[in-house]
Amino acid sequence: MCVKNDYDILLVVILFWAIFKQNGTALTTYAEQYTNRNIPESMAPVANKLGFAETQKYAKDSVWAKDAQFRKLKHNQSPYKIWDYPDYFKNDANTSDYPMGASLQLWNTEIFQSINPFFVVLFTPLIIVFFNWLRKKGKEPTSATKIAYGLFISALSTLVMVFAVYYSSNGHVKSDAVWLITSYAVITIGELCLSPMGLSMVSKLAPLKYAALMMGGWQLATSIGNKLSGVLAKNWDVFTNKALYFWLNFGLLMLAFFILIVLLKKLNRAFTTD
């Protein structure tokens, strides 16, 4: 029975990682193509010295022909090039302010990958203090309940991106970086509620002779989630309305959340018995 409970946890974990791991795929694409990455002039020297900046020249060049959603256009089944401005300026509302040939300083797309680790360091002690405070008041949720909270909070992060798409008119104008940063902040809180608790429950619920096996199962679930994340991200260009893509992510996380809610009493009982 304990092993069966572990399987239940691993199932919802797969769906969580499938969404979370899109920080290296869909969210990076959103940062590159749909996010305003202009660096304020006052910060540009420091950003350059730290290697956080890239230069984009506002001048026409030979570029791939793309539609409004940055999908390559084809002629006779083959992509083709046109004489136009770089992709970054396709949905930049400020192009009228740029002199021809101007060099803009932009935040590297890769910088957004560091947001999650930054928030992990920032939020971890705060969450520990919060749960310790609840424990002293006798109101600390169970490990399974924390995982459920983590799934729900993570789902909210995808709603942030839905609003970002609406705010930017489905990418016709660039959205503020604050949307992406907020989404990372929210899903990091969800990660800190779910990942440590899930790993702890899997190890504690498994019989001693299966402990190593179930720890391997956790890694396998993470791996499957990574694969599913890639499958989802591969279909990014299928969605003309990018809000629908993030609604799909929201739906998958809420599915995992409701699955866990249904199993919550059984998991809490098994954990208490253990």
Q: How would you name each of these model-derived features?
A:
Residues 1-184, 188, 195-199, 205, ...:
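Disordered extramembrane loops and terminal tails of multipass alpha-helical membrane proteins
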Residues 209-213:
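Conserved short cytoplasmic inter-helical helices of the MFS fold
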